[in-house]
Amino acid sequence: MSTVSYYTAEGLKKLKDELEQLKAIERPKASADIAEARDKGDLSENAEYDAAKEAQGLLELKIKKMEEVYSNARLIDESQLDVSKALVLSHVKIKNQSNGMEMSYHLVAESEADLKTGKISVTSPIGKGLLGKSVGEIAEITVPNGILKFEVLEITRD
């Protein structure tokens, strides 16, 4: 059973570009590697040929999985999102109630999460805890070492 995944325009383009890269460049390279290994002689004792065939099989599996993800991908219509609540694509500024530290996160789909750039998945513990919250609300988030309380200070969209 396939699962629908939601993407921003940027995330969907990145997925499509990666899929095209695999099909247009990696697939022909894998075929060329097999042909080169085949030309080296007896296939029954040719470890290079076996490795090339295995690599091709793994590549085809990856392509198939990515095609399935892409076919079930849906573009998020930002105009339909409620701007008063923390939802996917929201920029949320929060304050840790225990230490007063302020942080800003961009809530994104799981496939687009990148903590280095401040993008957290809506399926992460913090992302789940912030979903649906409004400015001024306290989000109680269960993490492995206890419960964190964050106050939502600001919600914006690009």
Curated annotation (Swiss-Prot):
PROSITE patterns: GREAB_2 (PS00830). The keyword Transcription regulation applies. The gene is greA. Belongs to the GreA/GreB family. Necessary for efficient RNA polymerase transcription elongation past template-encoded arresting sites. The arresting sites in DNA have the property of trapping a certain fraction of elongating RNA polymerases that pass through, resulting in locked ternary complexes. Cleavage of the nascent transcript by cleavage factors such as GreA or GreB allows the resumption of elongation from the new 3'terminus. GreA releases sequences of 2 to 3 nucleotides. It comes from Flavobacterium psychrophilum (strain ATCC 49511 / DSM 21280 / CIP 103535 / JIP02/86). Signal peptide: none annotated. GO terms for biological process: DNA-templated transcription elongation; regulation of DNA-templated transcription elongation. Keywords: Coiled coil, DNA-binding, Transcription, Transcription regulation. The lineage of its organism: Bacteria, Pseudomonadati, Bacteroidota, Flavobacteriia, Flavobacteriales. GO terms for molecular function: DNA binding; RNA polymerase binding. This is Transcription elongation factor GreA. PANTHER family: TRANSCRIPTION ELONGATION FACTOR GREA (PTHR30437:SF4).
